[in-house]
Amino acid sequence: MGSVSSLISGHSFHSKHCRASQYKLRKSSHLKKLNRYSDGLLRFGFSQDSGRGKSSSKMGKSEDFFYIKVSQKARGSHRPDYTALSSGDIGGQTGVDFDPATPPKLMPFSNQLEMSSDKGAVRPTAFKPVLPRSGAILHSSPESTSHQLHPMPPDKPKEQELKPGLCSGALSDSGRNSMSSLPTHSTTSSYQLDPLVTPVGPTSRFGGSAHNITQGIILQDSNMMSLKALSFSDGGSKLAHPGKADKGASCVRSPLSTDECTIQELEQKLLQRETALQKLQRSFDEKEFASGQTFEERPRRTRDELECLEPKSKLKPPSQKSQRTQQVLQLQVLQLQQEKRQLRQELESLMKEQDLLETKLRSYEREKTNFAPALEETQWEVCQKSGEISLLKQQLKESQLEVNTKASEILSLKAQLKDTRGKLDGMELKTQDLESALRTKGLELEVCENELQRKKNEAELLREKVNLLEQELMELRAQAALHPAPLGPPGVGLTFSEDIPALQRELDRLRAELKEERQGHDQMSSGFQHERLVWKEEKEKVIQYQRQLQQSYLAMYQRNQRLEKALQQLARGDGPGEPFEIDLEGADIPYEDIIATEI
């Protein structure tokens, strides 16, 4: 018998990368592929040991793709086996979770009907994957997703086919059925859709009734519908759940502003819509290609199967052969018609979805173009505001530094003012002491002047007295020379002669005292004059120092007032104004007009 299964390769395509992402998850560029080979034998199990088993599909996950692992578990009830699914990457992306109840349980019909000796019911069997034999090898290259199927060796002898020891009542197909390897799942969230095609093979050589054939057709149609629904759900899963599909490869961004985050979300949604639309388009193309290929391969496979059945059906009567061939052809025609109707319905739904997505895409593009100028304007305003904020911060730092320097300067000036006030108080005390000493000296000087005046008066009196005595003496000498006196008693003349030297001595003594008094008066007057000059110089020095202290005190006071006003302006938040002067009482008095305390 000829080959029954068909090999239809899925075409993978990659979705677009998220353009807004600044950090991409870079993985290895080497694509890992999992090739699964099957020998193409259709085994029909009628025994209780090996023919009754349950095929449980397990979904395994590798780094770059999902695959379905088929394992055989023996059970005791009469139940058909389930086949492995080859519909591409289940889920499409790494972050998608599947519910076990979501995809229906698939029961693909093997298109070969076999009647057992005990019961006349039709039993569908599953494809049992085994290792490839030397005759049929499926080559898959990592550079391409296409697969080549090599021809198989000629049919096995009938003795091997009909051996009851291998499998009771089982038939083997000489053609090798091969299932395409599961497609790779790249790290850029790409997925493949491989349409599931259930081959239609000839019916069993042991015959069958129309009722059994009808039951097989109904069962096979339900399985085909389940497979198509699963394939379509795989193709449109990203459209139904765009948020889940992007969890695995979500983009990481730094914190942005509200407007920028909104624009970023809109761009991501637009990219998701574009990706979903492209995937739907490619899925539609793949399904269309698969349908065309199926329609083209069906007549060829039918002819091949008929040619293979001809040499083996010579032992059967011609009526049974024609009946079997007619049943197979009718079954194939019905199946092709059903598939055609299903594909047309899927095409119409996909076209409607494509129109809807194109409309949404155009609306998103219009929104993007409308938001672009507003976004640019907002970004420009944000840049300007950030520049102004940085400038204000710099000015604030400079103002704080200036305030700190002014405060330190004010503290130093206050300390200097305190020291100057202490010195001024000390000088005032010293000035008061000097003034009191000057007053006492003035009083002493007045006393000395009064004493000098008294001495002068006494000296004048003594001088007048001496002049009178000298005049009397000259008169007496003149009289004595002109008129000698008569001799009188000796005692009188002797007394008079003795009185003259005494008077002369008294006169000399008085003259010496007068000279001494004059010298003392001159010395005292010169001393007083010198002391007066010294005290006058000291007074001038004290007055000069007082004027300097008053001037420095006024300058310090004005400077403190200016600094206090500047600090008040800075505390109120006003800018530094123009330099100002302080109007104080007596602040504009010139240096020459400052009068010291009266001494």
Curated annotation (Swiss-Prot):
Record family assignment: Belongs to the LZTS family.
Biased segments, Polar residues type: 174-190
Keyword annotations from UniProtKB, A to Z: Cell cycle, Cell membrane, Cell projection, Coiled coil, Cytoplasm, Lipoprotein, Membrane, Myristate, Synapse, Tumor suppressor
Disulfide bonding pattern of the chain: none
Subcellular location: Cytoplasm; Cell membrane; Cell projection, Dendritic spine; Postsynaptic density
Originating organism: Mus musculus
Bias (Basic and acidic residues): 153-162, 288-313
Domain of life from the UniProt record: Eukaryota
Annotated GO biological process: negative regulation of macroautophagy; regulation of dendrite morphogenesis; regulation of postsynapse assembly; regulation of synaptic plasticity
Name this polypeptide is given: Leucine zipper putative tumor suppressor 1
Post-translational modification: Phosphorylated on serine residues. Hyperphosphorylated by the cAMP-dependent kinase PKA during cell-cycle progression.
Coiled-coil zones: 256-572
Listed GO CC annotations: apical plasma membrane; cell body; cytoplasm; dendritic shaft; dendritic spine; glutamatergic synapse; postsynaptic density membrane
Function: Involved in the regulation of cell growth. May stabilize the active CDC2-cyclin B1 complex and thereby contribute to the regulation of the cell cycle and the prevention of uncontrolled cell proliferation. May act as tumor suppressor.
Positions of region (Disordered): 135-190, 288-324
